Structures are given as structure tokens and as C-alpha cells.
Curated annotation (Swiss-Prot):
Residues 337-347 have a biased composition (Pro residues). Its main location: nucleus. GO terms for cellular component: chromosome; cytosol; nuclear membrane; nucleoplasm. This is DNA-binding protein REPIN1. The modification Phosphothreonine is found at T30.
Length: 559
């Protein structure tokens, strides 16, 4: 649909895919006019008859589906390089000769200064974004989702729902669920349940006001003065549990614990939270963000309490190096030093008349592990940590029976069976089942290589790669075959070697019935099915008999 009108190669690269939205028909004309084999979300929805749109971006050449535009764009560059018929003008490649002939007609009628032209009306634009916006006027009738009440059509169902709420609200008889408190009606039962939480909060607020008694004019209600001099009053009390708060928004957020309301939802995995700070902290798992760095060793943490707990390890090690007295491991001593940074809101605890204020006491002591000295703020975190020392693994997988010491590890492992990959890379669209895998993958996009070998100076993006490389200098081979006693420096080499004893051949050729124990043998074998020069560089025309050689060659063109 987007054709760059020029005689010579396009400046951005002839094989560069151009992104475009809009449905089309399965004809040779429209198939080749779409940008570089990229199919839109609307096209997939219209042709699949309402199938799920999770992987609706489809390549027009190989029919593979992808979760996002970026992943499809990266795939299309490699997929198009395999097509056998290149355009002599711009280098774009096609699978069939009629498509190439149709494409060449565009160059025959083009002029160098017309830019991006609409193939329907001939109007030219300086940029492809302006052309995309213009094409929506032509493709209005192709939008797959139609409003049943008017003539408007939409690409996505959420656009239709927003339009229906704004322009076509349901009639009173179509809203059978009526609130008994205020008389407001709703079309769905879950909408009524969500609305009733407002009245529950109002009832709790009235009960709290009655429990606190009448307020003096001109000042908020306060409790009896507590010993401690500068203790701050907490006038807002929860009617259900009696917990007090200094500010009313904290009380409103606390009420959600009793009502069960969780209005803040994670857009990545759908998990819901009562407070927005909890959601912000949770989303760092998906993004891999660790905003709290340690000033001593550079290690980064997602949460500030974890950084404070980690910094105590450096303080203990400094005291040990200076010969200072160390507290016993079983009973840690409270230090009178103030916290590194004053918290904006101290811990909310029930305070009654005559009871000492928690703010006047020393900061809460950490629960310290007797084996390694690591401190934890909560006892349940300490118990989970101590399972690592004892070897206890109480959480078992229901699918394969594998045991884990932490429930979070079991949840992450269960994604192996379910196939769920909630962590997506923003650069290439690749998805991962664990946040740590995404964080390690992000280093592939970063140009820096922070892990340097002290022996030869070679740099690596990942620390395990450096550890495996250093075994070349040390000669260490820790992985021993139990069958023949042969040792290897890397575990992957041992796994590959053991297939000689087991006879396993997991790599099967898709073109014939042969299978191989090594992936390299399969790659070498597949060359016999591929004719010479099957992989052609779309920029300079050089041909290769292996896709890996083509990709390595394209790096010279900065593709």
C-alpha cells in the first residue's frame, strides 16, 4: 500500500519494511501493495472471523503471526531477503512473477519528487505517516467492526464500546440491575457490584464519624494527648478494625482491604492491587527496572527496603575489617543510628489513649538469618530465606513434580507448562516467561559490555558468559559425563555429548526423515535441500547458501 516513488534505491534501505494499518482482501493486487509483507491487526480480525487478536500481526509471505509490529518488522526484513525475484529499480523482492510485474508499474509512472503517493487517488505526501492518515479515509468501509445503531465503523472493539457509551447509552428497560441505595440502574451485574462499593465506603465513613464523636468547630477531631510530647495525632479511624491514620486518603486506601476492591490493574499480567504504589512497584517486575543502586558495590534493587537491608551487609563487613565488636547472629542489636532517609508516612498502627506512640520508639529491628547474617524486615521473608540453607522445597509443581523453595519460583516455573510469556521486550517484541530473562535479553540491545575478562580483556554482555570464558584460561572442566568420564568446560557441551550414549536425535529435518543429535549437523544437512544462492542480499545483490552468512553480511550495511 505504501510505495516510495523514486527511480533509485530508497534511502532507508530497499528491504526496509514500512508499517501500515488497514484491512485488505486476499488478492494479488492488494497483497503486493501492502508494505513489505506486513499485515495489520484489522486484517487478521476480519479474515479470521473474530479470532483472538493476541498475535494478529501476520507476515504476508510466510503467514507467520507475531505479537507486535516490532517483531513483525524485524522478521519481514529476513523473510523478504529469501524471496527469489528482486525488483531491478529498488531491490524489493517478490515470490511470484505477476506480483513483480505489478510492482514495476509503479516505477514506470513515478517521478523522483513525488514522495509517497496514494495508489487509490494519486495524491502525494511528503511522509508515510501522512499517507497512512490519508488512507484511513479510503479504508473506512473496510473497518471490520460496525456499530449496530449507526453507520460508523471501527478497527477495535474497545473503540466501539467507547462510542456506544458516548452516543448510544442503553435505555432504562435495558438496564435491569438497580441499586437499592440510590436507584441508579446498570446494564450488567458486575457494574452494579462495583458501584455498591461506593455506598459501602460511605457507610464506613459514617460509622467512623459516629465512633469519633462530634468535632469541635474549626478543627479536626483529635484523640486524647499521648505521652511523647511531639507525637502526631491520627484523627481518621477505620470503623472495621480501629486502625488510625493521619490523612484521609490513607484511610480511604485502607478501606479497600475490608471491601476487597482492587481498582489498580497491571496492564501486562492483569494482577490487581488496592493502592497505586503497589502497582508501580509490581510493574518493575515486567520492565526490569531497578531504580535503587548500592553505592558500595553497584548492585541494583527494585525496592528501597531491599537496598536498606543490603547496605547493612557492607556496614557489618566494614566493622569486621576494623576489628569492631559485632552483634551476635542470633540476637541482632538495635543500632541507634537514624534511618538513611525519613519516610513520608510512618507505619500506620492502632493507637489508643494512653498508649505510647510508635513514632517515638526506635526503628523496628530486622529479622536476621543466623547462618549468613542477612536481615529481613518481615519474619515470613526470613522463613522463606532459611529454606535455602536447609534445602527445604515445600512447593511442588502439579505438572512435573519438581519442588521449589519459594512459591514465586513455582509460579515462574509453571509458565513453562502454560506457555505464558508476560514479559515483552520493547525493542524487538520478543517475550519471556521470567523478568530476569528479559533483563538479560535487554543487554543484547545495549552496546556496552560491562563484564571484562581480566586475563585477555575480552568483554561480554552477561556474567555467565564471562564465567564460561574464564574456564579457557583456567582449564577447569567441572562437567563430567557419568558414562565415560569425559569432562567439559560448559554444561551445554556435556548435554550434547550425552546424546552419543542415549542415542537421542532431537533435531529433525523438516524436508526429509533424517534426524540429528547436533544442531550444527542439521544446519549442514539442510544445505543439501537448498539450491545455491537461495539467500540474496537485498542491498548489494550478493547471494549466500546459508541464512546465517546472509545475516552476518547484512551487518556491514547496518541492517
Amino acid at each position: 500500500m505504501l510505495e516510495r516513488r523514486c527511480r533509485g534505491p530508497v534511502a532507508m534501505g530497499p528491504a526496509q519494511p514500512r508499517l501500515l494499518s488497514g484491512p485488505s482482501q486476499e488478492s494479488p493486487q492488494t497483497l503486493e501493495k501492502e508494505p513489505q509483507g506486513l499485515r495489520s491487526r484489522g486484517t487478521a480480525a476480519a479474515q479470521s472471523g473474530g479470532q483472538a487478536l493476541g498475535r494478529a500481526h501476520r507476515c504476508a509471505h510466510c503467514r507467520r503471526h507475531f505479537p507486535g509490529w516490532v517483531a513483525l518488522w524485524l522478521h519481514a526484513r529476513r523473510c523478504q531477503a529469501r524471496l527469489p525475484r528482486p525488483c531491478p529499480e529498488c531491490g524489493r523482492r517478490f515470490r511470484h512473477a505477476p506480483f513483480l510485474a505489478l510492482h514495476c508499474q509503479v516505477h514506470a509512472a513515478a517521478t523522483p519528487d513525488q514522495g509517497f503517493a496514494c495508489h487509490l487517488c494519486g495524491q502525494s505526501f511528503r511522509g508515510w505517516v501522512a499517507l497512512v492518515l490519508h488512507l484511513r479515509a479510503h479504508s473506512a468501509a473496510k473497518r471490520p467492526i460496525a456499530c449496530p445503531a449507526c453507520e460508523r465503523r471501527f478497527w477495535r472493539r474497545k473503540q466501539l464500546r467507547a462510542h456506544s457509551r458516548r452516543c448510544h447509552p442503553p435505555a432504562p428497560e435495558a438496564r435491569p440491575f438497580i441499586c437499592g441505595n440510590c436507584g441508579r440502574s446498570f446494564a450488567q451485574w458486575d457494574q452494579l457490584v462495583t458501584h455498591k462499593r461506593v455506598h459501602v465506603a460511605e457507610a464506613l465513613e459514617e460509622a467512623a464519624a459516629k465512633a469519633l464523636g462530634p468535632r469541635p468547630r474549626g478543627r479536626p477531631a483529635v484523640t486524647a494527648p499521648r505521652p511523647g510530647g511531639d507525637a502526631v495525632d491520627r484523627p481518621f479511624q477505620c470503623a472495621c478494625c480501629g486502625k488510625r491514620f493521619r490523612h484521609k486518603p490513607n484511610l480511604i486506601a485502607h478501606r479497600r482491604v475490608h471491601t476487597g476492591e482492587r481498582p489498580h490493574q497491571c496492564p501486562e499480567c492483569g494482577k490487581r492491587f488496592t493502592n497505586k504504589p503497589y502497582l508501580t512497584s509490581h510493574r518493575r517486575i515486567h520492565t526490569g527496572e531497578k531504580p535503587y543502586p548500592c553505592t558500595e558495590c553497584g548492585r541494583r534493587f527494585r525496592h528501597k527496603p531491599n537496598l536498606l537491608s543490603h547496605s547493612k551487609i557492607h556496614k557489618r563487613s566494614e566493622g569486621s575489617a576494623q576489628g569492631g565488636p559485632q552483634p551476635p547472629a542470633s540476637a541482632p542489636e538495635r543500632t541507634p543510628e537514624p534511618p538513611p532517609e525519613p519516610a513520608p508516612e510512618p507505619a500506620e498502627v492502632p493507637v489508643g489513649p494512653g498508649q505510647p506512640s510508635a513514632a517515638a520508639e526506635a526503628p523496628p529491628s530486622l529479622h536476621t538469618c543466623a547462618d549468613c547474617g542477612r536481615g529481613f524486615r518481615l519474619e515470613r521473608f526470613l522463613r522463606a530465606h532459611q529454606r535455602q540453607h536447609g534445602g527445604e522445597r515445600p512447593f511442588a509443581c502439579a505438572e512435573c513434580g519438581k519442588h521449589f523453595g519459594k512459591k514465586t519460583h513455582l509460579v515462574a516455573h509453571s509458565r513453562v507448562h502454560s506457555g505464558e510469556r508476560p514479559f515483552a521486550c520493547e525493542e524487538c517484541g520478543r517475550r519471556f516467561s521470567q523478568g530476569s530473562h528479559l533483563a538479560a535479553h535487554r543487554r543484547d540491545h545495549a552496546p556496552e559490555r560491562p563484564f571484562v575478562c581480566p586475563d585477555c580483556g575480552k568483554a561480554f554482555r552477561h556474567k555467565p558468559y564471562l564465567a564460561a570464558h574464564r574456564r579457557i584460561h583456567t582449564g577447569e572442566k567441572p562437567y563430567v559425563c557419568p558414562e565415560c568420564g569425559k569432562a567439559f568446560s560448559q554444561k551445554s557441551n556435556l548435554v550434547s555429548h550425552r546424546r552419543i550414549h542415549t542415542g537421542e536425535r532431537p533435531y529433525a529435518c523438516p524436508d526429509c526423515d533424517r534426524s540429528f543429535s547436533q544442531k550444527s549437523n542439521l544446519i549442514t544437512h539442510r544445505k543439501s535441500h537448498i539450491r545455491d544462492g537461495a539467500f540474496c542480499c537485498a542491498i548489494c545483490g550478493q547471494t549466500f547458501d546459508d541464512e546465517g552468512k546472509l545475516l552476518a553480511h547484512q551487518k556491514k550495511h547496518d541492517v
